[in-house]
Amino acid sequence: MTVRNVSTSSPAWARARALAVVLAATSLGAAGCSAVGPSANHGSTGGTAAGSGASGADSFGSPADPGAVKQGGSLVMALSAEPDKLDPALSRSLYSRYVFNAMCEKLYDVDQSAKIVPQLATALPTVSGDGKTVTISVRTGVKFADGTPFDAAAVKASLERDLTLKGSGRKSELGPITAVAAKDPQTVVISLSKPFAPLTAALTDRAGMIVSPTAAKQLGSNFASAPVCVGPFKFAKRVPQNSIDLVKDPNYYAADKVHLDKISYRIITDASIRAANLRSGDVMVADSLSAQDVPGLKQEKSLQVLQSQSLGYQGVTFNIGNSDGVDAPPRMRDTPEAKDPRVRQAFEYAIDRAGLVKVIFNDLNTVACSPISPASEFSSDAAQKCTAHDPEKSKALLKEAGVQTPFPIEMITSNNPDSLRLAQAIQSMVKEGGFDLKIKPVEYASLLDQEDQGQFSLLQLGWSGRIDPDANITNFVGTGGSQNVSGFSDQQVDDLLAKARQTQDVSQRRDLYAQVIDRLHQTDPLIYLYRQRNLTGVSNSLKGVQVFPDGVVRVALAGMAK
């Protein structure tokens, strides 16, 4: 693998200029589409070191000063895609995490520095010497939104639900749990069959959201229709494809810190319309700003743009063995791209990552060739190496594989303008490497359904990222992972990931993940493209909106400026 930079006199720069011309010619068609998708949020070249790019200083926002905000008022936030099921066990999208953040607290949270801090727990877990017993103390005097007491028994019930509910996306995240016990009302004891280093980090996300046992029992499989948790706000109403409303929860244990009366999340899938609504004041917060809109929004005196490097990535995923659905055992598909890794490798060689970052995102995003953020303590130079952009190598690999050229393949993507611009850029690039890429735009909800069912050859989608790399890797490429929509199964990868899960030693895990990523570049079930910036527009009429590296927009403790 080579590492190089792009200069304005290089061939890569010339390709970027040519790509810009292609995109200018196609942008009018893209702008007419308005369905949901993640690319606005959720480079050589491929040969440039991952993480390169000029993206500016991080701005996470600040907590609300109680003396500077009013009591009461309604906040309207525009979401770039509709949240999926509002059930922490079943949810898969970043957009549901925005809503959950205001209504479903977790055992642990992450702070602005991406460090783990207690939330419903009172301290970080204690772990036995053999790593197989984890003890967590939880808050007292807390109630769920329906009045049910929050205690260790409720935590036990919620974790057991995550482990047993059909379709749960949390089971693989929670690892080798064999039992959960409520030692006393304030103490939870988790038993493991083997040490599991990522457990605490997993409890900072949906696996750590504790649901009301009363509501879970009463609603059963319909829990998402009226979710009940512990949080500053509680669920009020949902209008599909339109809005989700939350109202202040008087049962919340820190209700005196909640300033707003109501939060309304409105689904506005077109980035330019979200920006226009920000300018007009019809919405006060907007997620996933388009890189095309950021310069203009920064000039608005009534607005601010919060931006920070995310822990996630955007990429493309090949369907290798998802023949019977993501929950079924992998069974290799009878297609050249599934059966021969040289076809997938050729696709990676054909992509100019730096060109994508420069032309599509104005260098706000950065090149990514790894699921691990360069800022992570688990990162290394080896983990961030990129495959060089080399169209001739791409064509040579296709020839070795004995497939027809140009090799035809269809890619599904969200049909919002930014996602389509990205897809068209990829289409233009890989053509030079011997591919005939067809683009199939679909709504975001449909994309999630199709990837689960294995109804695709190639898809473009990303991941908002987590602080522990296990959550960015194992669920997606580990055999049987809850989000392994590729149906990829590789014993070497599985063995390395299993070893990394069982050790607390950072240096050992760092080395193991570097080996995993090297193997992924050899097999290419998923090609990482770029690491997105968290770009959030906020009205200056609000105080206290924050966006941390986990990508979640935090509005629950915001307030209207006096």
Positions of the model-derived regions?
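N-terminal lobe/hinge region of extracytoplasmic solute-binding protein
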Residues: 4, 75-127, 160, 228
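Extracytoplasmic/peripheral linker and loop segments enriched in polar/acidic and small residues
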Residues: 68, 125, 342-345, 357, ...
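Surface-exposed binding/hinge segments that line
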Residues: 137, 172-215
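Alpha-helical secondary-structure segments
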Residues: 151-158, 185-191, 231-232, 260-262, ...
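Gly/Pro-rich hinge or "lid" segments in bacterial periplasmic/extracellular proteins
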Residues: 204-258, 262
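Ligand-site clamp/hinge motif
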Residues: 251-296, 415, 436
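Acidic-aromatic pocket-rim loops
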Residues: 312, 316-325, 446-502, 549-552
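Structural transition elements
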Residues: 366-400, 418
